[in-house]
Amino acid sequence: MSKAPAVGIDLGTTYSCVGVFQHGKVEIIANDQGNRTTPSYVAFTDTERLIGDAAKNQVAMNPTQTIFDAKRLIGRKFDDAAVQSDMKHWPFEVVSADGKPKIEVTYKDEKKTFFPEEISSMVLTKMKETAEAYLGKTVTNAVITVPAYFNDSQRQATKDAGTIAGLNVLRIINEPTAAAIAYGLDKKAVGERNVLIFDLGGGTFDVSILSIDDGIFEVKSTAGDTHLGGEDFDNRLVTHFVQEFKRKHKKDLTTNKRALRRLRTACERAKRTLSSSTQASIEIDSLFEGTDFYTSITRARFEELNADLFRSTMDPVEKALRDAKLDKSVIHDIVLVGGSTRIPKVQRLLQDLFNGKELNKSINPDEAVAYGAAVQAAILHGDKSQEVQDLLLLDVTPLSLGIETAGGVMSVLIKRNTTIPTKQTQTFTTYSDNQPGVLIQVYEGERAMTKDNNLLGKFELSGIPPAPRGVPQIEVTFDIDANGILNVTALERSTNKENKITITNDKGRLSKEDIERMVNEAEKYRNEDEKQKETIAAKNGLESYCFNMKATLDEDNLKTKISDSDRTTILDKCNETIKWLDANQLADKEEYEHRQKELEGVCNPIITKLYQGAGFPPGGMPGGPGGMPGAAGAAGAAGAGGAGPTIEEVD
C-alpha cells in the first residue's frame, strides 16, 4: 500500500481546516457533515464526547461542558492577563494547575480536567480522521499552522497537541506564511512582488508583508492583534440585541447561559448573511422565559456597531508597512484571508487605505491557510512534483530575542522579523572583578528593559577563572531552527566551558511523561467513542427490529396467514422490548444484543414457519434473505450511520 501523503492543518481559534496536496493540486477535505471547515469545539455529555460540528450544534443545550477557544489558552500561564480576561466570557470552567490553565468538565458523571493541548489534540484528531476517511489511508505526517504572533511556548504547545493526536508534526508554520504559499502556487509572477496578507479570522488578526521572488518567500514584517476577529463582531451584535430585548420585554436574558448561546448562534448567522445582503432577520422561538424574539438588523447598523473594531484593523496594516520599511504604493498584491474578510466594510476600508487598489479574493479566505500548509507538507514530505519544487519558504521570528545585561537592559541578539532558521553569536564579559559565574537570562520582546519583556528561560555558566571585570570573554549563541525552537549556548573562551538551554520546558511546557500519558488517554477516549458508537448501533438495531417486526405483521400477505396467538406473542414481545428500551436508554451493547437474540428467538420461528407454510419463494420474504428485520445486522447497519440519516437538533 502506498504511503499516505502528508496533510496541512489550519488549527484555528474557532474553525479548523485540513488539506492535502495530491495529483498536482491541493484538495481541501470536507468532514463527515460535508463541511470544509470544522468548528474547533469539543463537548462532553453524560454518555459521550463530541468533536466539531456535533459539539457546536449542541452547545446551547450544554454550554458549560462545551469547550472552544482552546487556542486562546494553549502555551499560556493561568495568570496571563489575556487568560484572565477571556475567562470572564467563557461558560466553561478554567482552573489553575501549577500555574497552567486546565479546563474542568463533567464527563460520564466524573469530574475531569484537560490541558489546552489535550483539547486541541482532540480537534487535530478529528482533522486527522477527516483526512483518513477521504484518503483511505492512515495519516501521520502533518504541517500545523499558528498565528504569526505566537511565541515559542505557544508554538511548542501546539506541536505537543499534534503529538498527542498521534501526528508527526513536520513543521509549525505561520498562518500568513501558509496563505502566502497558497497564493504563490496560484499566481507565479516574474520579478519580486510585495504582498500584504490581511488575515481576519474568527479569533485572531494578523497582517504580514512578504516579498515573493522567483518562488522564494520572505516575510518582511508581521503585525496584528491576537484578540480580534469574527467573534468580537458577534459579541457586539449579542450586546445590541440583549439591550433591545430589555427594551421590548423588560427582561434581562444575560442571566440565562442557554438563551445567550442561542442568541449568539443567531447573531453569527445574521453576520454572515449581512456580507451578501443588506438586511438580516432573527427569529428565535421562546428565547427567554417563554418570550419569542423576532427582530432584524441592517448592514449599516451592523457596521455602526462595529465601526471602531473595523477601523482598528487598519493600524496593524500601517505598522507592518513601517516595519517592512515599505510605502503602501509598492505593495503589489493584497490578499484576504479569514472568513471575516468577507465583510464589505472591512474590504472597503482596506481598499481606501491603498487608494482604491483591487483586493485579491481569488483564494477562498477560509481555506487559504490549510491550502498553503498542505503544499508545505508536500514539500517537507518529499513531494517531487514540479508544482512544489519551485517553492522555498523563509519564515521569521515574531519577536526579538536577547539576554539581560547589567542594569536589566535587554541586549538583543536576534531582531524580530529575522528570517529563520538563524544563528547569531555575540561576546559578553563580566560585570565585577573575580566574578565566578554568569547568569544567562533569555528574553523575548521589543522593550528596552527586560522586566517589560517575556522571560523564556535562564541558566548559569560557572567556573570562570578569577579575573578583573571586563577580561573574561563569554560567547553567547542563539540558534533558532525551522520550527522556531530556540537553543542558547554560553561558552567561556579561556576554559572552553559551556552550558546551554533549549527553550521549551522552562516555559511551562508539558513534560515527555505528560505527553505520553495524554497520548494514551487520547487513545482511550477514541476507544470509548468507538464503543459508544457500537452501543448506539446495537440499540438502534434492536429498536428497528421491533418496529420492522410490527410492520411485518400488518403486511397484507401475512395478516390473513398468522394466527391470533402467534400475532399476540410477537406483538407482546415487541411492545415489552420497546418499553424496556425506553426505560434503559443507557444499557450497554451486550444487553441490547441479548434482548435482540431473545426477541429473535420468539419471532423468527413464527415468521419462518409462516413463510414455509405459505410456500413463498425465499425472495418473497420482506427484502429477501437477510432482509428480515435486523437479521444479518441489516437494521443495525442503519443505526450505525450506514443507511440511517443522523438527525441532530441545531438550536
Curated annotation (Swiss-Prot):
Mutant lacking the gene: phenotype: RNAi-mediated knockdown is lethal in larval third instar (L3) stage.
Subcellular location: Cytoplasm, Perinuclear region; Nucleus
Gene Ontology CC terms, in alphabetical order: catalytic step 2 spliceosome; cytoplasm; cytosol; nucleus; perinuclear region of cytoplasm; plasma membrane; precatalytic spliceosome; presynapse
InterPro entries: ATPase_NBD, Heat_shock_70_CS, HSP70_C_sf, HSP70_peptide-bd_sf, Hsp_70_fam
Region (Disordered): 621-651
Keywords: ATP-binding, Cytoplasm, Glycoprotein, Nucleotide-binding, Nucleus, Stress response
Main location as per UniProt: cytoplasm
Compositional bias (Gly residues): 621-630
Glycosites: 35
Subunit and partners: Associates with the elongator complex; this interaction is required for some functions of the elongator complex but is not required for regulation of microtubule dynamics.
Family: Belongs to the heat shock protein 70 family.
Protein name, entry field: Heat shock 70 kDa protein cognate 4
Organism: Drosophila melanogaster (Fruit fly)
Source species taxonomy: Eukaryota, Metazoa, Ecdysozoa, Arthropoda, Hexapoda
